[in-house]
Amino acid sequence: RDSRAASANGGDGKAPRVARWMGNEKVLLLTFPDAATQRRALGRASMYLEDPEHRGRVAKALPAGARGGVANYSGHNARVRELVAFYNDARGDDGRGAWEDERAMMEALVDAGVVRKEKCGRVSVSAEWSRGRGRDGWGDGEPSTTRRDVVPEACVIAVCASGDAREVQDALLHEAMHGLWYARDDFARWCYDFYLGDALDDAERAAWVEFLRELRYDVSVEEIVVNEFQAYMATERVLFGPDTCAGKSSSSKKSS
């Protein structure tokens, strides 16, 4: 099921398509018309949520090159409430701080019924989706990202279009695993137990953290570390596959 919204700037075709995953309606897929639009719509939000220098702060511009980090990845993911928090901060006191493509994305989520727009222009998660919806009813308690109190919530994932179908498939699988993390509390808890249990030793966990640090993730946040671990280990076939052992060059499928 999907819906399409007009652009925040008068129907210029830049609004993303919003589709719900049939297997779990809490997972929403955003499809943008091109990679540049997706980067402008989600780049600053990803920095706000995952970048070590900008976490919790709205960047004034998107960094280029190696310093681009999470802003430059071809895949993005976030809880809807996290996107809402970013957008409200980005708007600023005068309501004009959000970029055009960020506004178009939020309007698409409003039209999909996932986000509610207030008269003042601020947004909030629609009550129907504030804890997510599923066969087992609603999650309860306050939303949390702590290890033992993960509440299933509505989330969005996005993947850039590309002429390489295999690349798109790999990136989509990676982002879908993040969707499961947000939407299924039992899955997230299992991943925490695996990562922090006896399956890995301290040296292996340290190596993983260093890998994420080089990709410019905020490794001080345990959820980021474990969430990325499960997504990479469940789907990565290039960086950690047999081709790597054969000495073939490779790059992260998330890099654009």
Can you name each region flagged by the protein language model?
Residues 1-100, 104:
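N-terminal low-structure segments adjacent to metalloprotease catalytic domains
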Residues 170-183:
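Active-site recognition of the HExxH zinc-binding catalytic motif
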